[in-house]
């Protein structure tokens, strides 16, 4: 299997399966001298880990990360950083009945056709459990970006099924299990999820992620545009079926006079471009959003086939998130941070000595 590494200079390679012995990753390209501890990563891992509320999977994993290499006396050495998280709460017997079946709208069928074999336990490598290592790697990138460059990456849930948020209060994001920025919507989301869980069904969600303090100049046209790499990174997250940068698909209905982000000496008048112009950061906030599909692993019966092509009724009895979007905010933050870290290093390598006299504009 190829395709397990992301990035050009700041690279992240993950390994492991949902019900395997452990998950791991190798981070290469991190500059030396960054103060780094397991606690730096654990904070974000605790935000993502399962079993933290009644609205997520009840699989109980501590997700305790260990640093294996690349850190000496509390600082990065510039060598590969090895990380590992042991799996401790697998219940593989829950999946024995689907060992020879393909769940609808799942990776079972496509993995089987591609590799001729698959780990059916919890989805194996296709499970979102893999994203724990992305969050750990993203925490390293986030610390560097914030400490060295003043870049802050953060996200929130903006829609759960039919429920859309009306307010953006960053302080509120950390006060509820949904990462919801609108306190008035939390009880509605709780009631909706309680009813959904009783039905045995699932629902999708939308996550917004924002990076502030990004300097102008990051991005490598033509094929490695900043927004192209960001879309790639976000689209690689399990269950993501749509990505928007800035105004996204709303720009279809916008006229040019409305969509263009006019500039004044005091700053930009809008940010429909999402902080990226021509594939290069403009100095405005980088704004992206993702749409996550409802999980297909349900206890409600659905039509599928077995390995011989015979029709079967598929019922999934494992522990699953009724809304995968509830725990996706830290993952989206991590992937944006990894992209920005990679592009900062690439920009520094080629254009670090470029100086212009034009002032850097903010957003009014």
Swiss-Prot record:
CDD domains: Chorismate_synthase (cd07304). GO terms for molecular function: chorismate synthase activity; FMN binding. Its EC number is 4.2.3.5. Its cofactor is FMNH2. Gene3D superfamilies: Chorismate synthase AroC (3.60.150.10). Pathway: Metabolic intermediate biosynthesis; chorismate biosynthesis; chorismate from D-erythrose 4-phosphate and phosphoenolpyruvate: step 7/7. Keywords: Amino-acid biosynthesis, Aromatic amino acid biosynthesis, FAD, Flavoprotein, FMN, Lyase, NADP. Transmembrane segments: none annotated. GO terms for biological process: amino acid biosynthetic process; aromatic amino acid family biosynthetic process; chorismate biosynthetic process. Homotetramer. This is Chorismate synthase. It comes from Marinobacter nauticus (strain ATCC 700491 / DSM 11845 / VT8) (Marinobacter aquaeolei).
């Amino acid at each position: 299997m190829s395709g397990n590494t992301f990035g050009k200079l700041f690279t992240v390679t993950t390994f492991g399966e949902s019900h395997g012995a452990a998950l791991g990753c190798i981070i290469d390209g991190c500059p030396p001298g960054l103060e780094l501890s397991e606690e730096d990563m654990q904070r974000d891992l605790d935000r993502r880990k399962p079993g933290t509320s009644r609205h997520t999977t009840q699989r109980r994993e501590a997700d305790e990360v260990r640093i294996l290499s690349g850190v000496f006396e509390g600082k990065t050495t510039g060598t590969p950083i090895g990380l590992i998280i042991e799996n401790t709460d697998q219940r593989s017997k829950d999946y024995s009945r689907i060992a020879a079946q393909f769940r609808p709208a799942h990776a079972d069928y496509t993995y089987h056709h591609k590799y001729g074999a698959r780990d059916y336990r919890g989805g194996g490598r296709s499970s979102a459990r893999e994203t724990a290592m992305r969050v750990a790697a993203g925490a390293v990138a986030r610390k560097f970006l914030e400490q060295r460059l003043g870049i802050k990456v953060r996200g929130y849930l903006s829609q759960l099924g039919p429920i859309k948020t009306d307010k953006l209060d960053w302080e509120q994001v950390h006060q509820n299990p949904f990462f919801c920025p609108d306190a008035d919507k939390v009880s509605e989301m709780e009631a909706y999820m309680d009813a959904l869980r009783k039905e045995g069904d699932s629902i999708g969600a939308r996550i917004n992620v924002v990076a502030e303090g990004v300097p102008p100049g990051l991005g490598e046209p033509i094929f490695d545009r900043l927004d192209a790499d960001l879309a790639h990174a976000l689209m690689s997250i399990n269950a993501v079926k749509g990505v928007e940068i800035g105004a996204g698909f709303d720009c279809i209905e916008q006229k040019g006079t409305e969509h263009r982000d006019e500039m004044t000496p005091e700053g930009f008048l809008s940010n429909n471009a999402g902080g990226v112009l021509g594939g290069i950061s403009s100095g405005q906030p980088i704004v992206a959003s993702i749409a996550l599909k409802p999980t297909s692993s349900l206890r409600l019966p659905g039509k599928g086939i077995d390995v011989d092509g015979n029709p079967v009724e598929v019922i999934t009895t494992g522990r699953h998130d009724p809304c995968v979007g509830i725990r996706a905010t830290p993952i989206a933050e991590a992937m944006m941070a990894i992209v920005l870290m990679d592009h900062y290093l690439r920009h520094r390598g080629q254009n670090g000595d470029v100086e212009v006299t034009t002032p850097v504009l903010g957003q009014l």
